[in-house]
Regions:
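Alpha-helical solenoid repeat scaffolds of the TPR/TPR-like class and their adjacent stem/linker regions
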Residues: 1-180
């Protein structure tokens, strides 16, 4: 079952079992040759293990399979050392204007363009793309600032000095920090 293999590969990757994880990813790709999520995961694995050239190849394989796979461009940008080619920038610029490209993919693409233009020292274009990415991301976010403020105010109302004084004897008495 490829879903079980994907889950196991992810667990192995997160626990430094890179070799075993890579073997599982490759076995999945034998069955699903165009699975962009697996190539993306392989790219992340290579990045984490320090093999940046293979990470770049894996990320590029994603957009060779699906040119609209925005996470591949964002992952390249997130390497911090990758420089987009003029052709990649041109293609990304066209795709973010395409009404058929999903909002989520455009978010990734705008972030990638932000980094690409920043590297070119075209700071206005960089800012514009970062701004658009953040705007689109905010529109799709479930986070509501007012809800956060209301929650904080509610905690202030409930967690009074009186509440804590009634619970003064509770808990552990050591002043040592607890790391969770």
């Amino acid at each position: 079952n490829s879903n079980a293999k994907k889950a196991l590969a992810t667990c192995l990757f997160r626990t430094d079992g890179y070799k075993e994880s890579l073997e599982l990813y490759d076995s999945i790709l034998e069955e699903e040759k165009n699975n962009t999520d697996i190539y993306l995961s392989k790219g992340h694995l290579y990045k984490t293990s320090g093999d940046i050239d293979k990470a770049i190849s894996s990320y590029k394989k994603c957009y060779e399979i699906d040119r609209y796979f925005g996470d591949s461009y964002w992952s390249l940008a997130n390497l911090k050392t990758y420089k987009f080619t003029d052709k990649e920038i041109k293609n990304l610029t066209k795709m973010v204007l395409d009404e058929n490209v999903s909002k989520n993919e455009k978010i990734f693409m705008h972030f990638a363009l932000g980094k690409a233009f920043e590297d070119l020292k075209d700071y206005q274009s960089s800012f514009n793309n970062y701004h658009l990415a953040n705007k689109l991301k905010k529109e799709s976010s479930l986070f509501k600032y007012q809800d956060y403020i209301d929650d904080c105010n509610n905690q202030k109302t409930v967690c009074t000095k009186d509440l804590f004084s009634t619970k003064n004897e509770w808990g552990f008495t050591s002043d040592e920090p607890i790391f969770i």
